[in-house]
Structures are given as C-alpha cells and as structure tokens.
Amino acid sequence: MMKNMARKNQKAPWEEEEEIIWVSRTELKNDMLALQKLGEELVELKPSALAKFPLPEDLAEAIKDAQRFKNEARRRQLQYIGKLMRHIDPEPLQAALDKLRNKHSQTTALLHKLEQLRDRIVAEGDSAIEVAMEQYPEADRQRLRLLARQASKEKAGNKPPKSSREIFQLLKEAMLAKQEIEEESEDDLDSAE
C-alpha cells in the first residue's frame, strides 16, 4: 500500500507548465479518414477544375492515377492519397474546394433568375425587356422583342416553347458576356496593383 502511495505522489516527468495534448488512436484515424475523403473529393473533380488547385506534383499524379483506376485499386490509391495529404496543409485545398462548390451554387441561382426573367418577358413584354436590358445591356433588344412576341403566340397556340428557349439562351449569352467583362476588369485592376 505504501508503494502505491509513493507512486501517486511522485512528480510527473514533464513540467507542470507544459501542456501535453494526448490524441487517441480513434481521433488520429478520424483525421486520416477526413484527409482521405478530401482526396476522394479531389479525385471526383474534372481535370480542368483540378488544375486550379495548389497541389504538389506527387499528389497531382496520384489523383490522376486514381481517376483511371476502378474498384479495389481505386480504394488503395485513395488510401495512398490520404497518406500523401498527411504531409501537406489541407486548408488551402479545402478552401479551394469550398470556393468551387460555392461557384456552382451561384451559377445555379443565376440560371434560376434568368428563367424567371424569361418568364416575365414572355408574360409582360416590353416592360420586362426594359428590365432585362438594364441588367444585361449586351443583349439584343430587337431580337428579344421578336422572340417575346413569338413566345406569346406559341403559348397561346399550345405549341412547343421554342422561342422561350431562345430567349433563355440569349439572356444566358448576355450574362456570360457581362461576367467576362467583369472578370477582365478585375484582372486589369489586379495587374495595375
């Protein structure tokens, strides 16, 4: 009994001020699985999107290999990618992936707005076309008016909405042109600094 008391009263081999963080094996394993899952998300990306990520050369090569593999080889390659990711900081990769996901959701929201604008143009005519021209001055006003009249006739005659689709495509092209102009102006500002 005295021996046990003596052990309990002994001073620990580290200083009291030092804080030792004990990490369980389960926690380590969960961290590794999270890295492997991040690697799996990177493997699912298209090569064009993957090129925008700040990847070390060996990791980029491993991801390209994993995209070719099937079944068991793919699973082993994903584990290897997880192992490679232990040696790099995953934060920039996660941030770039989040930015990419956000961009897709923004694009979807813009397409929904374009659909609503198209429906307004078909229903209201010139007043909605004026709103569209304020948002997208690159759009062809005369073509929009012509397509709006045709879409109204198609809707009244229960015909397929060919003109409505053309209005949507016209608005989409105008939106893309506006985005390109904005991106070029941002690039010009960045290069000027």
Swiss-Prot record:
Organism: Vibrio cholerae serotype O1 (strain ATCC 39315 / El Tor Inaba N16961)
Gene Ontology BP annotations: assembly of large subunit precursor of preribosome
Any one GO MF annotation of this record: rRNA binding
Organismal lineage: Bacteria, Pseudomonadati, Pseudomonadota, Gammaproteobacteria, Vibrionales
Pfam families with a match to the protein in the record: DarP
Keyword annotations: Cytoplasm, Ribosome biogenesis, RNA-binding, rRNA-binding
One cellular component (GO) term of this entry: cytosol
Protein name: Dual-action ribosomal maturation protein DarP
Signal peptide annotation: none
NCBIfam families hit by this protein: PRK05255.1-1
Function: Member of a network of 50S ribosomal subunit biogenesis factors which assembles along the 30S-50S interface, preventing incorrect 23S rRNA structures from forming. Promotes peptidyl transferase center (PTC) maturation.
